[in-house]
Amino acid sequence: MITASPQEIAHKLGSGLLSFPVTHFTDDHSFDEAAYRENIGWLGQFDASGLFAAGGTGEFFSLTPPEVEQVVRAAVQEAPDGLPVIAPAGYGTATAVQMARSAESAGAHGILLLPPYLTEASQDGLVAHVKEVCAATTLGVTIYSRANAVYTEAAVAELADSCPNLVGFKDGVGNIEQMTRIYASLGDRLTYVGGLPTAEMFALPYLALGVTTYSSAIYNFVPQFALDFYNALRSGDNAFVVNALNDFVIPYCNLRNKKQGYAVSIIKAGMKVIDRPAGPVRPPLTDLDAVELAELADLIKKVS
């Protein structure tokens, strides 16, 4: 059981690599809880600093709120002792508040607040949204800046001042100037998480901006390689990092970019390659075809 404060949990998250497991489905797209639980146990053999259940890689956007709670509860119960499990909240403010409360009831150790659904919002609106979610839970909240919820440094500073349990900022934009402004303004008040697809591509320059960790989707199917990459990054072994980028990460991203939505689909394909299948992706995503799967298998062989 974890009894640490939100700030202590955020510090732990920032000290190592973050696991973002896929969500397992049966052939009819139902949640396969038994397979999911088994996989959380398998991932627990490797040294991640946090587990983000039902996040983007876990197809949050295709899960119902009750399914999200079911996934989070399973992750909490199967994760190794001492490993923080972070749950998602999203959609409109009322739903996000409900999801944050449900996550806390399920035993989660923190909240990742994803962008609101299907609408643009002003900075004032985004600030109000985050404040309501933070007020609804005692858990630490990390905001995910991306898509229709890109937070300015002024908005993040206001939230950091107003919400003691705002503990993290996850960047899914890739705007170096914006990230520099936020880090320069807030320093170690927050834990900074890299959240662009295949975050390993951006890890080297982002480390200089205080982004000490990131969501590793490839950790799902090449966990040791993902950890070796992260440890090389943090120890300053840039030669290893560059070789790994050229040997695996860049060609992997080329394959990922062949179709929209493959950032998630390719992860489940990777699990199929290593004989740990997680089932299909739910529509509207599509699975890789046989040729693409073979290409991915060749890449995985290089780093396994």
From Swiss-Prot:
Entry EC number(s): 4.2.1.41
Gene3D superfamilies recorded: Aldolase class I
Coiled-coil residue spans: none
GO molecular function, one term: 4-hydroxy-tetrahydrodipicolinate synthase activity
SUPFAM superfamilies, per the entry: Aldolase
Pathway the protein takes part in: Carbohydrate acid metabolism; D-glucarate degradation; 2,5-dioxopentanoate from D-glucarate: step 2/2
Example GO BP: D-glucarate catabolic process
UniProt enzyme class: lyase
InterPro entries linked: Aldolase_TIM, DapA-like, Dehydro-deoxyglucarate_dehyd
Transmembrane feature ranges: none
UniProt keyword terms in alphabetical order: Lyase
Cross-referenced NCBIfam families: KdgD (TIGR03249), PRK03620.1 (NF002958)
Sequence similarity: Belongs to the DapA family.
The name this protein goes by in its record: Probable 5-dehydro-4-deoxyglucarate dehydratase
Species annotation: Rhodococcus opacus (strain B4)
